[in-house]
Amino acid sequence: MIYLITGGERSGKSSFAQKLALELSNAPIYVATARKWDADFQNRIDRHQQERDERWTNIEKEKYLSEIDFSQKTALIDCVTLWLTNFFVDHKNDVALSLEEAKKEFLSIASQKDTNLIIVTNEIGMGVHASTEIGRKFTELQGWMNQFLASNADEVFLMVSGISVKIK
């Protein structure tokens, strides 16, 4: 099964996703896609790791999720926005190339046998309009990837103020 959890910043996506993962498995995998850009990001990563107990296996993977064996496992991937940022930066803001590579990676993990994937993403297009060209390009990339993920997901939840709304 593929579950997509989307919503705005601090809407409760990660908490909902973690609860779902623990309902599906006694030993879920947590895949963090954040790149360690600076000390602040490292502190954020450390804090998030401390929030999860011994039931979780933590994996840090910036881009190539297909290198992880998800077969017969439940995995929470948090989050698509940071994952896409890594492709976008590495491909010098090339939307088409970033989207193509991210889709390819997703299809690779989605085809693994007997896997529960819980994917957290952000609806950044619902917020303030980006003031820079790069910001607008990234918003488009995120929107197109979210549409692709939602079309491939079995269930999609929109988080609003800590409340989950099933939309698919």
What is the meaning of each model-derived region?
Residues 25, 56, 72-73, 114, ...:
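Short, well-ordered alpha-helix to beta-strand connector turns
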Residues 2-69:
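Conserved P-loop
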Residues 4, 76, 118-120:
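Structural motif
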Residues 17, 48, 76, 122, ...:
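Residue-level signal for inorganic ion chemistry
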Residues 9, 35, 81, 124-125, ...:
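Short, glycine/serine-rich, charged loops/turns that create anion-binding
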Residues 28, 75, 155-157:
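Short, well-ordered beta-strand core segments
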